[in-house]
Regions:
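Macromolecular interaction modules
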Residues: 1-104
Length: 104
C-alpha cells in the first residue's frame, strides 16, 4: 500500500510569513521534484498556528523509507533548509505506511 513522509516544523510567529512564502515557492516544489513523490501537500495546524505540516505521498513504504532514511535527495534538502533557517525551526520527520484506506 501507499506511504507518506510527514514533516512537521515548529515555526516562530515572527518567521511564519517568510517561511510560508519560501516553502510555497521554493521548498515544496523542490522536494516534490527531488523525491519524485506522487503528490506533495502542506498546511498549518488550525489549533496550533506555529505548526506547519508537509505531506509527501509515495506508492509504497519502501520508496518513502528510501527517501527519508538518508537519501542524497533528503540530505541535500535538509542542508538547504538549515542554510536558510539555521537553527530557528525545529522539525521532525515520520514515515507512515498505509495499512487501511476507505473512500467515499
Amino acid at each position: 500500500m501507499s506511504a507518506y513522509l510527514i514533516v512537521r516544523a515548529q515555526v516562530a510567529p515572527e518567521d511564519r510569513e517568510a517561511f510560508d512564502h519560501w516553502y510555497q515557492t521554493e521548498h515544496l516544489p523542490d522536494a516534490h521534484a527531488a523525491f519524485k513523490s506522487l503528490s506533495a501537500q502542506r498546511g498549518w495546524v488550525e489549533d496550533n498556528p506555529s505548526l506547519h505540516v508537509a505531506i509527501y505521498a509515495f506508492s509504497d513504504l519502501a520508496e518513502a523509507q528510501a527517501i527519508a532514511n538518508g537519501s542524497p535527495q533528503i540530505t541535500e534538502l535538509i542542508a538547504e533548509f538549515d542554510r536558510v533557517w539555521q537553527d530557528r525551526i525545529h522539525r521532525t520527520r515520520e514515515v507512515v505506511g498505509v495499512v487501511q484506506s476507505l473512500q467515499r
